[in-house]
Amino acid sequence: MRSGVIAQKLGMTRVYNDAGEHVPVTVLRMENCHVVAQRTVEKNGYTAVQLGVGMAKVKNTSKAMRGHFAKAEVEPKAKLAEFRVSPDNLLEVGVEITAEHFVAGQKVDVTGTSIGKGFAGVMKRHNFGGHRASHGNSITHRSHGSTGQRQDPGKVFKGKKMAGHMGQTRVTTQNIEVVSTDSDRGLILVRGAVPGSKGAWILVRDAVKASLPENAPKPAGLRAGAKAEAAATEGGE
């Protein structure tokens, strides 16, 4: 199991494949995605890596976090996230992961926070059909109707579809295809929509319901450098 990455959603556009077909894509950008810390079985009880992306102002970073980033020899990060990995894919602290971590045609799972819609009615939130427009209907056109039964059971069951806060929840979309990557600009183009607004942080992982392509780099797609080469060598042993 490889590490995932943290990317920022830039928006949607379109590209054309070799057959001339129009493909809607979401553009995700990876910016300074470094390994900030390790989690090992001996010390933490599980194996994972903590990644950080973006840049945060030093004055807006707490003293504890400044020490955390200094220990990893990386600049303060705007976003941190942990990814579970197998022991053979554990990355060294300080290495940088690039967009080449994924390959074209690969399936990935993306996780983000959906766009908040505020307090919404049942017709918008749950796609209810609503009531009649006339013939005796009075101000209940968009109402959800009855909420329960009678004295028995005498309550509203949990999970009843009603009006309420819509959106702004953690959403994972599975098996999205990677159309292409651009390592120089740190871009990942994935087919279709991705949960979240423009500028939102998105977690991208290898799909759990699809096999990993044979040409996918292991333990990760790393930036060329002394630390990266050392980590890749250790991972291949």
From Swiss-Prot:
Gene3D superfamilies: 3.30.160.810, Translation factors
RNA-binding keyword on record: yes
Keywords from the named record: Methylation, Ribonucleoprotein, Ribosomal protein, RNA-binding, rRNA-binding
Comp. bias regions, Low complexity: 220-237
Positions of post-translational N5-methylglutamine modification: 151
Post-translational modification: Methylated by PrmB.
GO CC annotations on file: cytosolic large ribosomal subunit
HAMAP family xref list: Ribosomal_uL3_B
Cited function: One of the primary rRNA binding proteins, it binds directly near the 3'-end of the 23S rRNA, where it nucleates assembly of the 50S subunit.
Family: Belongs to the universal ribosomal protein uL3 family.
Assembly and binders: Part of the 50S ribosomal subunit. Forms a cluster with proteins L14 and L19.
Name this polypeptide is given: Large ribosomal subunit protein uL3
Organism this protein belongs to: Brucella abortus (strain 2308)
